[in-house]
C-alpha cells in the first residue's frame, strides 16, 4: 500500500500532517513555495503564551518528516481532478498522481499599507508584527533609547472597510507578548496597546495579559487609532480615542507596531481556482461542514488543514493536521475497499 | 349632410374661407374643451401654490430676474433649447433627441401655425371665448370650407407647413412607439415603468396625431390640405366613395386631446408644462428649501420620468439598487410616500451624475439633501468647544498660502507629504492650517442634512481663514473644496484645489518635470468634476508627465468610486461593487496607472485596481526634481 498523498504548503499544518501520513505508511509529497519549510513559523522569534522559541518548535516539527518527499521553492502549476485521483503538475517539472490532496496553504498577513492612515511604508517608525519578530529574531532592534512605543490591534481584522470583518484570533495574544518583549528590551520606554477588546481566550493567555499590566506596566487603551502623522523630528504623533474615558487622546511615539491580521493565502487561492474550490465570504475555503468535517472540502479526496479555512492558533493548526491525516487515511481505506 | 352644412355657411372672407357651421360650434369639441379648461385651472392653482411656498426673498429674486435683460435672454434661450429642441438629449443620444424634439417642437409649431392661420384668415374667432377662441384654432380645418378657386399662395404655404410639421411629429411618435418595444435601440438600457395615468396620457398622446391626420384627411377636400392630408383624402375616397363620414374621426381626435389633458397632471407629461417654470426659477438663482414645496415642487413636476438617470446611477451596477434611482425618488416624493422617500434619500451617493445628465436639469441630489435635513437637522450637536480659544490654534499666514488638508487627506498621509513637497519645490511659502488640530470643513455635515451643525463649523473655520491673512487657500480634498467655494463666502481669498495649483506651476514652468513614457488615465472625482467643474486643469497638468488615456465614461459622466461620503446607508459590499465597475471603466484602454485627485477616490480605487493607483500630487512628486 503506497498511495500518493500530495500536501500543498509546508507550514506547521503541512509538516505535522505529512509526518503523520508518513507514519501511517503513505507516500507523502510535500511542496512549499518558499526556500525554507515552516511558513510564518520560520519567521517568528518566540511564541505565546509561554514564550518558547519558534525555531525549536519548528525543528521539532521538521524532525518528524524524514522520508517525506519534500520539494521547496515549488508550486502547483496545474491541478486536475481525475476519476478517483488528482493529477498535479508542479513548477519543478514533476507530475504527481495523488490519491488524496491536503491543502495546508495557511494565510497571508494583511498588507498593512492598505490602512494608509497608519502610515506603513510612508513613515519609518511604523512597522508590522512580522517586522518586529524579524528584528527580535535577528537581534537587530531598530531603535536607540526610545521613549514610547505603541501597538495597534486589529489592523485589517474586524474592519469592514479593510474588507475583513472577522477576527484574526492570534493578534491580541501576539501583541501582548510582543509588548512584554519590547519592554524587556527597552525597560524605560512607555508601551501602549490600542485595542478594541482583548480576546484572551486560550489557556494562560489571560495570565499573560495580567503579567503585561502588573509586571511590565504596559498601558492598554481601549479605542482605535484614527490617524498617524510624522513630526519634524521623525517621531510619530498618534491620534486615538480612549473610549473608556470618552476622550480623544494623542500620544507621541518612537515606533508604532501594526498587528496585521490574517488573510487567505493568495498562493492557496490560486490552487483553489484550478479546481473551482469554493470560498466563503471571508475568502477562506469552505468546508463540507464547519462543525463535523472542517478538514474535508466539498470534493472527495481533497482535504484541508490549518488556516486555509480561517484564522487559527498554532495548537489548533496542529490538531487539525493530525485529524486531517486520520480523515485521509479513512478516505483511502474506504476507497480501496470499494475496488 | 355636407351640403346642409355648407348651406348654413355664414360669412365669406376675401380669401374664400367660409365658416361651415353656425356659431362655429359642434358638440365634438366638448371633450377637448373640458380637458383644456381643466388643465388651465389646474395649472393656475399649481402656479399659485408653488409661488406661495417660495420664501418672500425668493419671490422677489424671481420677479427681479424677469426684468434683467441678461437673465431674460437666457430664459428664452433655455426654454427654446431645453423644452422645444431638447439640445441636451441630442448631444447624448441623437435618435432620442430627434424623437423628443419632433414631438415637442413639432407640436409647438402646429399650435403656433394653427393660431397664425386663424389670425390671418378668420381673426374673428380669436376675439373671445364666445367666438370659440379656445377650440377654434385647434379644429380650424373642421369649421371652414375653402373655395378652391380662391386658393392663395399664402394659404398653400400654411397648408404645406401644417402637413410638414404633422409629418415631423408623426415620425417622432413612430420612434416613441418603437422605443416602448425596444428601448435599447435608442440608447437606453433601463427605462421606467409607466403608471396608470402615464399610460392613459401616453396612449392618447400616441393617438392624437394619427387621428389628426385622419380627421384632417377626411375633410381635406373641403378645408384644403397639402401633401399629406390630400392623399389621405383621395385614398379614403377611393375606398368609401364620396360620402366620407368624418365625424367619428374628429370626435376621436377631440376625445384623445381631452383625455391627454385630463391625465396630464397625474402623469409624467406634466413636465411639458412645468419645465419652463423650472427654467425661470433656476435662472433666477433660487435654492431648494423644502423637499416637496416651492422650487422642489417645480422640479418634481418637471421630471419627465424618462429614466435616463437609471442608467447613469452608479448604484445600478447591481440590479437590486435600481430602485434608488432619482426618477423613483422623484416619483415617491410626488406621491408623498414618506417611508420610501427617506430610504432612497439616505442611500444616494450624491455623486450628481443624474443631475448632470438630466435632460430637464432636475437637481435631485439637492432635493435629497434637503429631505435629509427634515430628519437630521434637529439632531442634537454640541460644538461649544469651538468657541473656546485654546482648542484650536490660529494659523498665521500673512500674504502666504494657507493649506487645508481636511480629514480625508489626513487619513492618506501620502497626499499631504506630496503636497508639502510640491509647495517646497516650487518655492512657495505656506502655512499648514490643520496640521495638528483642525475643524471639519462642514461638507459631510451638509451632505447628511445637518445644516445647522455645519454652519457652526463653517463659521469657526471661516473666522480662522479670514484672520490668518492668507491670500490663497489651497485644498487637497475636493469634498472640502466644494463647501469652501459654495458656503464660505471668503472675500479676497482665492480658493484652489491642488490640481489647479500644480497646473499653474506647470504653465509657469516652475517645476522641473521629467516626462516619462508612462500612460495614465485620470479619474474625475465627483465633487471636483461635477461638483466644482474642474475637469481640464488636472488633465492638462498630467499631460506634462506622460501619456493621458481616455476612459469611456469620463468628465461629467465619470463614475463615482462608490465610497462617497454622500451615502448614509449604502453598505461596504455594494460600495465595493461600484468601485470595481469604476475601475473597469478606467482600465478600458489599458493605462499603466490610474491617477485621481481625491483622497476618498484614491483609497476606493486602490482597493480594487489591478494597476498602480497614484494620487495626483504623488505622481508629480515622483516625477519632479524636488530639491537642488
Q: At which residue positions do the language-model features occur?
A:
Chain A
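Residues forming the flavin
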Residues: 1-339
Amino acid at each position: 500500500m503506497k498511495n500518493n498523498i500530495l500536501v500543498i504548503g509546508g507550514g506547521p499544518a503541512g509538516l505535522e500532517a505529512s509526518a503523520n501520513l508518513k507514519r501511517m505508511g503513505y507516500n507523502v509529497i510535500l511542496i512549499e513555495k518558499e526556500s525554507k519549510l515552516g511558513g510564518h513559523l520560520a519567521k517568528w522569534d518566540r511564541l505565546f503564551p509561554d514564550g518558547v522559541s519558534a525555531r525549536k518548535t519548528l525543528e521539532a516539527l521538521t524532525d518528524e518528516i524524514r522520508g517525506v518527499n519534500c520539494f521547496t521553492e515549488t508550486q502547483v502549476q496545474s491541478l486536475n481532478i481525475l476519476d478517483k485521483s488528482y493529477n498535479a503538475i508542479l513548477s519543478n517539472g514533476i507530475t504527481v498522481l495523488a490519491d488524496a490532496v491536503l491543502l495546508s496553504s495557511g494565510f497571508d498577513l494583511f498588507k498593512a499599507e492598505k490602512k494608509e492612515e497608519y502610515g506603513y511604508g510612508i513613515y519609518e517608525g511604523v512597522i508590522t508584527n512580522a517586522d518586529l519578530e524579524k528584528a527580535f529574531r535577528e537581534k537587530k532592534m531598530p531603535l536607540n533609547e526610545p521613549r514610547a512605543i505603541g501597538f495597534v490591534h486589529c489592523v485589517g481584522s474586524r474592519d469592514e472597510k479593510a474588507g475583513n470583518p472577522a477576527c484574526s484570533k492570534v493578534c491580541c495574544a501576539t501583541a501582548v507578548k510582543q509588548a512584554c518583549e519590547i519592554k524587556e528590551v527597552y525597560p524605560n520606554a512607555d508601551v501602549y496597546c490600542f485595542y478594541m477588546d482583548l480576546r484572551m481566550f486560550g489557556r494562560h493567555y489571560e495570565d499573560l495579559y495580567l503579567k503585561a499590566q502588573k509586571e511590565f506596566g504596559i498601558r492598554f487603551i481601549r479605542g482605535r487609532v484614527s490617524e498617524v502623522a510624522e513630526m519634524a523630528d521623525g517621531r510619530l504623533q498618534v491620534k486615538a480615542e480612549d473610549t473608556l474615558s470618552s476622550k480623544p487622546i494623542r500620544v507621541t511615539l518612537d515606533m508604532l507596531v501594526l498587528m496585521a491580521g490574517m488573510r487567505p493565502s493568495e498562493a492557496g487561492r490560486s490552487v483553489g481556482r484550478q479546481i473551482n474550490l469554493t470560498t466563503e465570504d471571508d475568502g477562506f475555503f469552505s468546508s463540507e461542514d464547519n462543525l463535523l468535517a472542517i478538514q474535508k472540502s466539498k470534493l472527495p479526496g481533497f482535504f484541508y488543514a490549518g488556516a486555509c479555512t480561517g484564522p487559527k492558533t498554532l495548537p489548533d493548526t496542529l490538531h487539525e493536521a493530525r485529524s486531517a491525516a486520520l480523515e485521509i487515511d479513512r478516505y483511502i481505506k474506504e476507497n480501496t475497499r470499494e475496488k | 349632410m355636407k351640403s346642409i352644412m355648407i348651406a348654413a355657411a355664414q360669412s365669406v372672407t376675401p380669401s374664400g374661407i367660409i365658416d361651415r357651421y353656425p356659431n362655429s360650434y359642434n358638440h365634438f369639441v366638448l371633450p377637448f374643451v373640458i380637458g383644456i379648461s381643466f388643465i388651465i385651472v389646474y395649472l393656475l392653482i399649481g402656479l399659485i401654490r408653488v409661488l406661495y411656498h417660495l420664501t418672500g426673498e425668493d419671490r422677489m429674486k424671481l420677479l427681479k430676474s424677469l426684468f434683467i435683460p441678461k437673465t431674460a435672454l437666457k430664459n428664452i434661450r433655455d426654454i427654446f433649447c431645453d423644452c422645444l429642441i431638447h439640445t441636451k438629449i441630442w448631444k447624448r443620444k441623437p435618435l432620442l433627441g430627434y424623437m423628443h424634439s419632433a414631438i415637442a417642437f413639432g407640436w409647438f409649431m402646429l399650435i403656433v401655425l394653427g393660431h397664425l392661420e386663424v389670425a390671418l384668415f378668420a381673426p374673428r374667432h380669436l376675439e373671445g371665448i364666445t367666438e370659440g377662441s379656445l377650440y377654434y384654432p385647434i379644429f380650424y380645418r373642421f369649421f371652414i370650407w375653402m373655395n378652391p378657386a380662391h386658393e392663395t399662395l399664402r394659404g398653400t404655404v400654411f397648408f404645406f407647413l401644417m402637413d410638414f410639421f404633422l409629418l415631423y411629429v408623426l415620425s417622432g411618435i413612430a420612434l416613441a412607439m418603437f422605443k416602448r418595444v425596444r428601448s435599447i435601440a435608442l440608447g437606453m438600457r433601463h427605462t421606467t415603468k409607466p403608471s396608470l395615468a402615464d399610460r392613459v396620457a401616453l396612449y392618447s398622446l400616441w393617438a392624437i396625431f394619427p387621428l389628426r391626420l385622419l380627421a384632417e384627411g377626411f375633410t381635406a377636400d373641403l378645408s384644403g390640405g397639402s401633401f399629406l392630408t390630400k392623399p389621405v383624402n383621395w385614398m379614403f375616397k377611393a375606398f368609401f366613395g364620396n360620402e366620407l363620414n368624418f365625424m367619428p374621426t374628429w370626435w376621436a381626435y377631440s376625445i384623445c386631446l381631452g383625455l391627454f389633458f385630463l391625465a396630464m397632471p397625474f402623469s409624467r407629461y406634466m413636465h411639458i408644462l412645468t419645465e419652463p417654470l423650472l427654467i425661470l426659477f433656476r435662472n433666477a438663482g433660487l435654492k431648494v428649501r423644502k423637499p416637496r414645496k416651492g422650487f422642489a415642487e417645480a422640479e418634481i413636476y418637471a421630471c419627465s420620468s424618462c429614466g435616463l438617470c437609471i442608467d447613469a446611477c452608479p448604484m445600478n451596477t447591481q440590479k437590486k439598487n435600481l430602485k434608488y434611482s432619482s426618477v423613483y425618488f422623484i416619483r415617491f416624493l410626488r406621491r408623498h410616500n414618506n417611508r420610501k422617500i427617506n430610504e432612497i434619500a439616505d442611500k444616494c451617493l450624491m455623486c450628481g451624475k443624474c443631475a448632470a445628465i438630466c435632460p430637464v436639469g432636475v437637481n435631485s441630489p439637492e432635493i435629497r439633501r434637503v429631505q435629509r435635513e427634515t430628519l437630521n437637522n434637529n439632531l442634537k450637536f454640541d460644538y461649544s468647544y469651538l468657541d473656546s480659544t485654546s482648542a484650536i490654534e490660529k494659523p498665521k499666514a500673512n500674504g502666504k498660502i494657507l493649506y487645508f488638508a481636511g480629514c480625508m487627506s489626513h487619513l492618506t498621509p501620502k497626499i499631504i507629504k506630496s503636497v508639502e513637497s510640491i509647495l517646497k519645490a516650487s518655492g512657495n511659502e505656506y502655512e499648514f492650517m490643520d496640521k495638528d488640530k483642525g475643524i471639519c470643513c462642514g461638507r459631510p455635515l451638509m451632505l447628511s442634512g445637518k445644516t445647522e451643525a455645519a454652519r457652526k463649523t463653517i463659521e469657526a473655520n471661516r473666522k480662522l481663514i479670514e484672520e490668518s491673512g492668507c491670500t490663497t487657500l489651497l485644498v487637497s480634498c475636493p469634498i472640502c473644496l466644494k463647501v469652501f467655494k459654495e458656503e464660505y463666502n471668503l472675500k479676497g481669498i482665492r480658493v484652489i484645489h491642488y490640481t489647479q495649483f500644480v497646473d499653474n506651476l506647470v504653465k509657469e514652468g516652475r517645476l522641473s518635470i521629467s516626462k516619462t513614457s508612462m500612460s495614465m488615465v485620470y479619474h474625475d472625482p465627483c465633487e471636483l468634476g461635477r461638483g466644482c467643474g474642474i475637469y481640464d486643469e488636472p488633465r492638462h497638468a498630467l499631460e506634462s508627465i506622460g501619456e493621458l488615456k481616455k476612459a469611456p465614461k469620463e468628465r461629467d459622466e465619470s463614475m463615482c468610486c462608490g465610497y462617497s461620503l454622500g451615502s448614509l446607508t449604502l453598505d461596504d459590499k455594494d460600495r465595493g461593487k461600484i468601485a470595481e465597475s469604476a475601475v473597469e471603466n478606467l482600465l478600458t484602454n489599458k493605462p499603466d496607472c490610474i491617477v485621481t485627485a481625491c483622497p476618498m477616490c484614491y483609497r476606493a480605487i486602490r482597493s480594487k485596481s489591478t494597476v498602480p493607483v497614484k494620487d495626483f500630487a504623488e505622481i508629480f512628486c515622483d516625477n519632479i526634481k524636488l530639491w537642488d
